[in-house]
Amino acid sequence: MSESGKSNFNIIIQKIIKKSLFTERQIEIILKKKRMLDDDFSLNITKGAYYRQVVQSRKKIEGLYYSIILLQGLDVISLDDSDVIFRLAEQVSKMYDNSDFMPENQEQIMSVIDNAVKQIVSL
C-alpha cells in the first residue's frame, strides 16, 4: 500500500488480496520484481525491509505451487477446478487496470468469485 494509505489496486483486487495468502505490500513487491509496475512506482520502504519482503513473498509463492502440485496430485483439486480458477484469474487480469466498476458490479464479481471458491473448496 502506498505511503498515504491509498491503495494502488482497484476494489476487486483489494478484496481478493485480503482473502489471499499475501499482503498488499507483498503483491506490490512481486509486481515490481516482475517489472509489472511502473519504474517510477515507489514502495517507500527501507532496502532491508524490501529484501525481507521479497524473500517472504518468494517462499509464499513456492509454498503455493507445491500445495497446488500436491492437491492436484492427490485429486483434491480436479482439473475442472483448475480450469475454473484459471478462467477466473483471466477475468481478474482484465480487471487489474480497470477501476471503473460500479459498486454493484464489484459486489456481483466478488460474489461470483467467492461462490466459485467455496464450491471448489467444499470437502
Question: Where are each of the predicted segments found?
Answer:
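DNA major-groove recognition helix of helix-turn-helix
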Residues: 54, 61
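Helix-turn-helix DNA-binding module
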Residues: 35-46
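Helix-turn-helix/homeodomain-like alpha-helical modules used for DNA recognition
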Residues: 79-123
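Short Lys/Arg-enriched helix C-cap and helix-to-coil transition segments
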Residues: 62-77
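Short alpha-helical "packing" element that flanks the helix-turn-helix/winged-helix DNA-binding module
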Residues: 25-33
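Short, Lys/Arg-enriched N-terminal segment that forms or immediately precedes the first helix
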Residues: 3-19
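N-terminal leader segment of winged-helix/HTH proteins
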Residues: 1-4, 71
